[in-house]
């Protein structure tokens, strides 16, 4: 079941909301847990039991860990949860590489990847490690821990919510009109970003992938379009998750903060998928020593973190290269580039970031290293295509409006204009009046689109 499906929008979600608000407070977590299990079961009937099993192991293990505080217990728990992730996500990748290197013929396991396993595994790991560190107390209620891990708003594609972030809200959270209204508004904005912008950009990217009439300009259009698509697709899911969480009284942390206005790669990763980058910082980079043990250890730690970040996204060498590319850029910035960047005009700093990120997403999108390389050199005419052709002009005209909207929407320009207008009393009243009309209009347009286009998964579902 997808957030962008008629069944979710007009059946599942309204029923859950009604049940949640009519039951007594002590049953609210139970309603959310059952709803989340049903939500997951609709997409992954068999793997629902895997998730529940992992939650139970974390529940029992964390309580035992809190009493005995032994590293061996922590290592055992981490081995179980990381092992489950590795089995389903990386077994065939590992076997395939062994076969290629040694010429062996080990059969592939061909295990389907459980949806959301990368996200809920990281949540479980953060919970267990924080219990070991004494940052949080082990949850005594299995229901509350299960609700935290399986909470349907963020179960499938994040953001990665730390247990400490919503620990108190599992016991006591405020459900009021202000929270609910904010949640609805945030959800609808995300819905619009996904269906009306990300999906349209996805259509343009699909055209590029299938057409034989490429040009140098079309390579650039594709690179820009995919960079915008993945931003709007993933940030839309985060908006919807944060909005859904707020409807039920949970305050999830932000996951994106206009990353494409960054002036360095370091800043970019403080603005892009913030829950993932902060997770690797707190649970891998800092435990390895961070930047406290000299340059060689710093470089080693960054390489490890970004190799893991790449492989977390998928079992393909393109993801490893994508991660290591960012690792190398971050090392270069830390060692010497930052001081030179700061002396450059802001526009040049941003061009440097946008070009680097665009190249990285070409690699990220590719199914193979060869495909990635072909699309990168195509930007510079090395594939022999003409600068422009009739097909490129046609598709540019067809998608120009959505490209312009996406470019503007990826910056805080519109947000800043609205905030400045709100300072003026009369303008603020007009905005408050128009806002619900705008939200209703988006919902109507999206619904009309979804009636004819029933399946439109988020890009991050495959991770």
Question: At which residue positions do the language-model features occur?
Answer:
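Membrane-embedded transmembrane alpha-helical bundles that form the catalytic cores
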Residues: 1-462
């Amino acid at each position: 079941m997808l957030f962008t499906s008629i069944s979710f929008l007009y059946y599942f979600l309204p029923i859950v909301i009604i049940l949640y608000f009519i039951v007594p407070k002590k049953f609210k977590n139970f309603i959310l847990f059952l709803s989340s299990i049903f939500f997951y079961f609709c997409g992954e009937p068999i793997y629902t039991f895997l998730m529940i099993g992992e939650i139970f192991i974390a529940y029992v293990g964390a309580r035992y860990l809190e009493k005995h505080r032994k590293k061996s217990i922590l290592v055992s728990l981490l081995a179980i949860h990381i092992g489950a992730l590795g089995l389903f996500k990386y077994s065939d990748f590992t076997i395939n590489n062994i076969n290629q290197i040694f010429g062996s013929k080990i059969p592939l396991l061909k295990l389907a990847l459980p949806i959301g396993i990368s996200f809920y595994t990281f949540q479980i790991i953060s919970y267990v490690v924080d219990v070991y560190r004494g940052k949080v107390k082990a949850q005594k209620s299995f229901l509350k821990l299960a609700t935290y891990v399986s909470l349907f708003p963020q179960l499938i594609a994040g953001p990665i919510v730390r247990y400490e972030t919503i620990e108190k809200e599992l016991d006591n959270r405020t459900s009021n009109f202000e929270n609910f209204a904010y949640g609805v508004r945030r959800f609808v904005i995300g819905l619009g970003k996904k269906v009306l912008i990300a999906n349209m950009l996805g259509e343009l990217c699909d055209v590029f992938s299938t057409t034989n009439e490429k040009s140098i300009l079309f390579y650039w259009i594709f690179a820009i379009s995919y960079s915008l698509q993945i931003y709007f697709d993933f940030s839309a899911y985060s908006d919807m998750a944060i909005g859904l969480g707020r409807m039920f009284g949970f305050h999830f942390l932000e996951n994106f903060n206009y990353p494409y206005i960054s002036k360095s790669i370091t800043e970019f990763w403080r603005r892009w998928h913030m829950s993932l980058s902060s997770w690797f910082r707190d649970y891998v980079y800092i435990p390895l020593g961070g930047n406290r043990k000299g340059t060689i250890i710093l470089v080693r730690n960054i390489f490890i973190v970004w190799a893991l970040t790449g492989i977390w996204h998928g079992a393909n060498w393109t993801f490893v290269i994508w991660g290591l590319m960012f690792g190398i850029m971050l090392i270069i910035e830390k060692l010497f580039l930052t001081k030179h960047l700061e002396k450059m005009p802001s526009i040049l700093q941003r061009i440097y970031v946008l070009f680097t990120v665009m190249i990285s997403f070409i690699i990220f999108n590719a199914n193979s290293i060869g495909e990635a390389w072909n699309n990168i050199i195509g930007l510079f005419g090395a594939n022999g295509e003409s600068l422009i052709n009739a097909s490129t002009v046609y598709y540019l005209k067809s998608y120009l409006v959505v490209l312009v909207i996406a470019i503007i929407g990826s910056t805080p320009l519109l947000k800043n204009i609205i905030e400045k207008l709100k300072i003026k009393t009369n303008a603020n009243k007009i905005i408050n009046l128009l806002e619900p009309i705008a939200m209703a209009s988006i919902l109507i347009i999206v619904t009309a689109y979804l009636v004819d286009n029933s399946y439109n998964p988020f890009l991050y579902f495959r991770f």
